[in-house]
A protein has these predicted regions:
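N-terminal membrane-targeting/pre-transmembrane regions
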Residues: 1-44, 48-52
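Short beta-strand segments
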Residues: 3, 116-118, 143
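Hydrophobic alpha-helical transmembrane segments
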Residues: 56-71
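Conserved beta-hairpin
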Residues: 76-117
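Short, surface-exposed charged micro-motifs
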Residues: 97-99, 124-125, 134
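Generic beta-strand structural signal
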Residues: 101-102, 128, 137
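Phosphoinositide-dependent membrane-docking surfaces
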Residues: 107-108, 116-131
Length: 174
């Protein structure tokens, strides 16, 4: 059986990849980062509140504390989009779209820059979102496959195929 995908590595796709990494391979580190971020936000709020209770005038320090808190909150709520934005900036020329062919032995991903053959043993985690299948190789690397462009079979057939070939269950990411 042979499955084919044509995928664009755009903001939407890279956000799905970032979310899959955050919720699987990076889960423990992400949780620690979120706790640290929220502690900094709470500290900024406490510092501003303490100065207000002491009836001290508003200073540049208060403005900076407020700014840090707002920026951290924005990043904490849009973490996947921010990571996708920076990942898109790091894409090498000619790698913004890929055609992938999955066969029994391996799969090949072809971009304008190169064609690369991958073996299923290298996959650490298989994920699925509403629009993409995601194969993760490490904390830093993964690939997305657009379900809308799947040819050679159905999404259900591909799920069975990729689960069998990688030996990994599929993690469903919302």
């Amino acid at each position: 059986m042979e499955f084919q995908f044509e995928t664009r590595y755009d903001q939407k796709g890279l956000t799905a990849l970032a979310r899959a990494l955050r919720k699987t391979i990076r889960k423990k580190r992400s949780r620690r980062s979120h706790i640290f971020g929220w502690c900094i936000v709470a500290l900024a709020i406490l510092l501003i509140a303490a100065r207000r209770l002491l009836d001290e005038p508003w200073t540049l320090r208060d403005t900076l504390n407020c700014g840090v808190g707002v920026i951290l909150i924005a990043i904490l709520f849009t973490e996947d989009q921010v990571n996708a934005f920076f990942a898109q900036k790091k894409l090498l020329p000619g790698t913004s779209s890929a055609k992938s062919v999955f066969t029994e032995e391996s799969y090949t991903s072809t971009t304008e820059a190169a064609a690369t053959e991958f073996h299923y043993e290298a996959v650490q985690q298989v994920c699925e979102t509403e629009d993409y299948f995601v194969l993760l190789f490490s904390r830093q690397h993964g690939q997305i496959y657009d379900k809308a462009s799947l040819s050679g079979g159905t999404a259900e057939e591909f799920r069975s195929f990729i689960t069998e070939k990688t030996g990994k269950p599929i993690a469903y990411i919302k």
